[in-house]
């Protein structure tokens, strides 16, 4: 019984591994002209509309800069 549980845990981990490897995080800048230093929430919305068609769940992080936002998002 214990060997079956260990085997199932190993199998699930093995099946989940390609999903972690296949996602690529991309870093791109997008201009933000409404504010000199935008809020983080404004950067997340700007990144989502610029690169993912409004899908905020694919945005990892949005870092504010001087009239820009640095966006980290996943493909797929």
Swiss-Prot record:
Changing residue 36 to A: Severaly reduced inhibition of KCNQ4 (IC(50)=117.5 uM). Residues 1-23 form the signal peptide. Changing residue 68 to A: Reduced inhibition of KCNQ4. Expressed by the venom gland. The record marks 27, 68 as: Important for inhibition of KCNQ4. Changing residue 56 to A: No effect on inhibition of KCNQ4. One of its GO terms (cellular component) is extracellular region. Changing residue 55 to A: No effect on inhibition of KCNQ4. Keywords: Disulfide bond, Ion channel impairing toxin, Potassium channel impairing toxin, Secreted, Signal, Toxin, Voltage-gated potassium channel impairing toxin. Changing residue 63 to A: No effect on inhibition of KCNQ4. One of its GO terms (molecular function) is potassium channel inhibitor activity. GO terms for biological process: venom-mediated vasoconstriction in another organism. Has the structural arrangement of an alpha-helix connected to a beta-sheet by disulfide bonds (CSalpha/beta). Since the toxin contains only 2 disulfide bonds, it is called 2ds-CSalpha/beta. Blocks voltage-gated potassium channels Kv7.4/KCNQ4 (IC(50)=2.5 uM), Kv7.1/KCNQ1 (IC(50)=2.8 uM), Kv7.2/KCNQ2 (IC(50)=2.7 uM) and Kv7.5/KCNQ5 (IC(50)=2.7 uM). Targets the pore domain, in particular negatively charged residues 'Asp-266' and 'Asp-288', of KCNQ4 and probably other KCNQ channel family members where these residues are conserved. In vivo, shows vasoconstrictive activity resulting in acute hypertension when injected intravenously in mice. Also induces coronary vasospasms ultimately leading to heart failure. Induces seizures when injected into the hippocampus of mice. This is Mu-scoloptoxin(15)-Ssm1a. It comes from Scolopendra mutilans (Chinese red-headed centipede).
């Amino acid at each position: 019984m214990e060997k079956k549980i260990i085997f199932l845990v190993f199998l699930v981990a093995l099946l989940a591994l390609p999903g972690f490897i296949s996602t690529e995080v991309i870093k791109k800048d997008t201009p933000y002209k409404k504010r000199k230093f935008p809020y983080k929430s404004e950067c997340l919305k700007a990144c989502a509309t610029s690169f993912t068609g409004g899908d905020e769940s694919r945005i990892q992080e949005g870092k504010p800069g001087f009239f820009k936002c640095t966006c980290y998002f996943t493909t797929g």
